[in-house]
Amino acid sequence: MISLESQVLQRHLSFFEHKSVLFAGGINDQFPQQVPARSVKVWSWYFDYAKSKSAVDFSLTCEEKADLMVFYWTKNKQEVQFQLMQLLAQAPIGQEMLIVGENRCGVRSVEKMLDAYGDIAKIDSARRCGLYHFCLKNTPHFALADYWKTYQHPRLGDLRIYSLPGVFSANELDVGTDLLLSTLDQPVRGKVLDLGCGAGVIGAYIKQQYPQVELTMADIHALALASSQRTLAENQLEAEVIASDVFSNVAGKFDLIISNPPFHDGIDTAYRAVSELIMQAKWHLVPGGELRIVANAFLPYPDLLDQHFGSHCVLAKTTKFKVYSVRG
C-alpha cells in the first residue's frame, strides 16, 4: 500500500530512470523501493519510519547529493521551508526536484515559496494531490541558527526553551502542558521518562525542580530531539535523549512516565501512538510506578486507561484538557 502522493508519482516513473534519487519530507511508505532509479536514498526526520527501512538517513541535516530530489509536502509550512531550503542550499545550479503533496496540506504554496529560486511548474493533479517540477537557478541561503526560536514562561521559572520548526510547543507553552505541570506539586523521585518530549519542556522542568531524578527523554522527531538537547544544554541540565517510536527504543523501568502525547498525525487525528503508550506503559513501570498524561477532554482515553490499569484518577481538568494518572 502506497500513499496518495506516491500514487501520483507512480504515473511519472520516467523521471526516475537511470538517476540517483533522494527522497525527503513526509514520505511514509515503500515507494522508494519501487522506482526504476540507479540508486535511491531517503532522508527522514521520523524515527518510526526510519527504524524499519534500510538506506534511510535519520538526522537533523542531510548532505546527500542526487540527480533528482523528491520532496513529500507536509502540513507544517515552517518545517517544509526548513527542509527545502536546506536541501537546495547545498545543491548545484540546475538541480531537479519533484514536490508532491495533498491539496488539503497546502502544497499549492510551494509555487510562491520556490519561485525566487528557480523554475517551478505544476505537472500533474490527481488523487487530490498536486505534483510540481522544480529546477534550481538561484541558490538559497540556509543557516541552521536562523531557525531556532526561544521563549520563557512564568510557569517554567528561569527555564528557557529552545525549538526548531515543526516541534510541538515550539513558540510558547501550550495550555495542556501548563495544566500537566501544575499537577507536579509533590516531589518527583527515581527514574523519569518524558515520552514525546518535543522541545523538552516537561523533562527540563522536572529536572530543574528535582535535580536528583534520573531523566530520559524520547521522541520520534529529529527536530524535537535536537530541540530537547539544546533546551537541556542551555539550562545546564543533564538527561539521556533518545529516538524512540513510543517504547520501541526505551530500556528499563521507570518510577514516572509523563507525557503530553500527540493526537494529530499530519492533519488527521491518530490514536496509534497514544494507544501504544497506554497499552505498553505497565511493562515499563516499576511496581507502584505512575503514568501521568494530559489529553484533550474529548478523547476516549479513560476507557483505555481503565482497560489496561483497572482504574484512573483525574488530577486536574479544564473544559478542554484533563490530566490522567494511573499506577502500575
Swiss-Prot record:
Recite the UniProt keywords alphabetically: Cytoplasm, Methyltransferase, rRNA processing, S-adenosyl-L-methionine, Transferase
Record localization: Cytoplasm
GO molecular function terms attached to this record: 16S rRNA (guanine(1207)-N(2))-methyltransferase activity; nucleic acid binding
Instruction: Give the top-rank taxon of the lineage listed in the UniProt record for this protein.
Output: Bacteria
Q: What does this protein do?
A: Specifically methylates the guanine in position 1207 of 16S rRNA in the 30S particle.
- Note the subunit structure: Monomer.
According to its UniProt record, the EC number is 2.1.1.172
- State what protein this is by name: Ribosomal RNA small subunit methyltransferase C
An annotated GO cellular component of this protein is:
cytoplasm
The main place the protein resides is cytoplasm
Matching HAMAP family, A to Z? 16SrRNA_methyltr_C
State the reactions this protein catalyses.
guanosine(1207) in 16S rRNA + S-adenosyl-L-methionine = N(2)-methylguanosine(1207) in 16S rRNA + S-adenosyl-L-homocysteine + H(+)
Question: To which protein family does this belong?
Answer: Belongs to the methyltransferase superfamily. RsmC family.
InterPro entries in the cross-refs: DNA_methylase_N6_adenine_CS (IPR002052), Mtase_sm_N (IPR013675), rRNA_ssu_MeTfrase_C (IPR023543), RsmC/RlmG (IPR046977), SAM-dependent_MTases_sf (IPR029063), Small_mtfrase_dom (IPR007848)
